[in-house]
Amino acid sequence: MAAVILAVAICVALVSAPLAAQEKVEEVRPPKLNYTTHKLANGLEVILLEDHAVPIINLQVWYHVGSKDEPPGHTGFAHLFEHLMFKGSAHVAAEEHSRIIESVGGFDNAETNDDTTNFFETFPSNYLERLLWLEADRMGSLNVSEANFKSEREVVKEERRVRVENQPYGYLQEDLRAAAFTVHGYHHTPIGSMEDLDKATIQDVRDFFNTYYKPNNATLVIVGDFESAQALAWTKKYFDGIPASAKPIPRLDNPEPPQTAERVVKKSYSNTPLPAVVIGYKIPARYAPDAYPLDLASNILAGGESSRLYQTLVYKEQIAVQAAGFGAFSEDPNLFWAYAIMNQGHTAEEGEKALVEVLDGLKTAPVDAKELEKAKNQEISGFVLGRDTDQEKAEALASAAVIGKNPALANTELGHYLTISPDDIQRVAKEYFALQHATVLIVTPAAPAQ
């Protein structure tokens, strides 16, 4: 814990003093995660990291199935199972999983993304055996009943109405992704479509569970106050009896073809008060070498109100009320998003031109040392503060293991950022921020109904 406090103190000092020498920045490292890995006979990957600072444990199960694995006509299934996994199993009643955790002072949650579906819980360390039993029970005997399926389908549909259909600019992500990806599963979002959810059958849903929710498609991570030998023994006790899938886990063979020309899509939304523009540039996968300088470039371009996009479009030119961006770094190549919501009297086309000019600025001149060091300091801050809790450590290990195929990446990733030079930023900007690799979504408010 003292090492963490010291690292955080150094990190804060660096962020507040961006003119510090570069060699000082490169000395900073978060504490190493001294984990062990194990593989059960049924293929379950197990990662253990002891941390005896407090009597708490974070346990996570990541299933290597996300929305990109959904075949056409079955969108939303991965997210649906995020909900169904709480509806009971052979020995646990519906919603009882969470109630048991809450009754001992813990908490749990889940999330679905393009690549994975993740379940996580934090609880007092003396309940580890019970929690392993709970996770094994729903992995091996989930109650995928007609009643559960229909009730959770309605919950998911309502979530879609709230998050997408009734939200200003709620369709931006769906429309840009649909245009940017013609073949790959990133074409659609995890929430799925109403049409696919409505036509889904109970057999479709059971087939999806029986295909992907298997121990040989899962990674179990335990971080906190436990003894590894005992934790591994309990894991084998409760998970060994769950059979692996009889066939290899299917993966859609749908790589996105190279994009060689700009695509422009124009949409009008009735619940959109102001014009907007979104540009999606194709970028490499999460742990690819070029992902690191692109991530720093994303910070320089869109890392808060001091970033180039906000300062130019909102503060100086005042043509937009919001301007930002982010890199969607995923298991497969995805998109860097740059977007602007325009001010009154300004068009989305103006916004597109301004966004492109700001991104082109990274191509024409290397970033100066001060700006690059600030971005690196923010990266260090994120890494150090992002290892402060057992949950954050578990997430780092799980992501590296499932998405990066190597948990050791959790310990080596920061080093990639610290060696990035201004020339590296300029090189990746030239290669990836090119309009022939971009999809542009132009949004205008729909005319009021007469």
Walk through the language-model features, giving the residues of each.
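Short pre-active-site segment immediately N-terminal to the catalytic Zn-binding motif
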Residues: 66-74
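Non-catalytic beta-strand/loop surface segments
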Residues: 20-60, 65-67, 92-127, 163-217, ...
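Non-catalytic, conformational "gating/processing" segments within enzyme and secreted inhibitor domains
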Residues: 153, 206-238, 437-438
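A common structural junction motif
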Residues: 136-146, 238-246, 317, 356-367
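Bacterial N-terminal signal peptides
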Residues: 2-16
